[in-house]
Amino acid sequence: MKKLFVAVLAIAGLVACNNESETVFNSSEKSIALTIANSNEATRAITDASATTDFECAAATDLTVLFADQSGKVVETRNLTAGDNTNGTYSFHKLPETVQQVGVIALRGNAAPATLAAAEAIWKTETLEAEVANIVVYGASGQMKQNNTCLVDGVNYPLFEGKVRVAPYHTRFEVLEFKCTDLGQNEYGYSKITLNKMTYGGQYEQTLGNVLESPTAVATAGEGKAWSWNWAPNKAAANLVVDLTVEGKGYTVAIPKKTLTINGYEDENGDPITTFASENVYKLKVPFLEANIDATDAYICVNVEVEIAKWVVNTITPTFGTDPTK
């Protein structure tokens, strides 16, 4: 799988306008042009599974442009595609002269904010179980400066430029699959997997649609989708320790449940991961193997291969706790 959510770069740029001496100059309104620089770059599957179909971080039709004054108050909003599109550059004219900065956001069903600060708050709102296509992406230009003038209907307006990088704020964690092999009696059909501590100390429980028919079967949550969560990056590290319990179906021996405790992750170079970054998706495959589970069912010792996907793509390996005193 390639990139997941690559950040979109929106550039408020220069419009090719004629600046003729006989035209009228009007400083009470202005023009701004926005170019989506990498809107054609493929990212990753639109579902939460490991499909190969790619999609972009945000299509032009998803983006709303917030034109704001110096204080950040939004004085006008327009859809990105409402601008004049010339080879990917969207030009907006006759904007209020109070416009000093621009925000670009995929609202994903949210109401248009009254300020850029409110837009940033929407962007940072935790949507733990939202799918990738429903995560808000946002960026702002900061204070812009006049670069030139732009001729519109025989009138020259001031042309301002700035740069806006539109990107996801969250870091994302996806459990792609659980592999159950030889869990007791050679076959360990199961009906439920419970995940603890990932969502800020809470519990997530998934009742599986299909019980495993063989010890080599692979289980995923729902219809081939991953278990996935979106965190504010400063909170992600607090969710490093994860307990996963597989619950037996018709299990006849003494231990009806098997538990894995993940207490760390490594990248593809074997280095510990201590922080999780915005715009990154961390993908993980978890094997439940009888040989890796302690007889007391308290701790295990397993290295699990993990793949990091980006909104940028990485590869990580969870490490598991084996010391019951820690």
Residue ranges and their predicted role:
Residues M1-L4, N19:
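Positively charged n-region of N-terminal signal peptides that target proteins for export
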Residues E29-A33, N87-T89, L159-E161, R172, ...:
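Intrinsic-disorder/low-complexity, polar/charged segments enriched in Ser/Thr/Lys/Arg/Asp/Glu/Gln
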